[in-house]
Amino acid sequence: MASTRNPSVVVYHAPGCHLCERALAQVRALRAELGFELREVDISGDPALEAAHREWLPVVEIDGRRRFTYHLQLDAFRRAVAQAAALE
């Protein structure tokens, strides 16, 4: 029988980014249902994070892999989290 685990989801965001606010709200709403660990990272003031993510915000990573930028597709997000949870 395959075991499941709690995937790690990271959302990179910045103040004043309306797409970020929407993605954060969506991810927060799905957290309890899908059982993932959530880390929210404000990139403002960190030159390395700004260089890596500013033009793509929001950026959503699942288990360290960039999966979504700009808009979060809810069905695809659910599938990606479920796939990550099934990995051993």
Model-identified regions with their sequence ranges:
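Local sequence-structure signature of Cys/Sec-based thiol-disulfide redox active-site neighborhoods
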Residues: 2-29
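Small/polar loops that bind or transfer phosphate-bearing groups
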Residues: 12, 41, 69
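A short, Lys/Arg-enriched amphipathic alpha-helix followed by its capping loop at the start of a domain
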Residues: 30-34
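Thiol-based oxidoreductase modules, predominantly thioredoxin-like and allied folds used
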Residues: 36-47
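Short glycine-biased active-site loop of nucleotidyltransferases that positions the nucleotide triphosphate
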Residues: 50-52
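Structural micro-motif
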Residues: 54-60
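Non-catalytic, surface beta->alpha helical segment in thiol-disulfide oxidoreductase systems
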Residues: 62-88
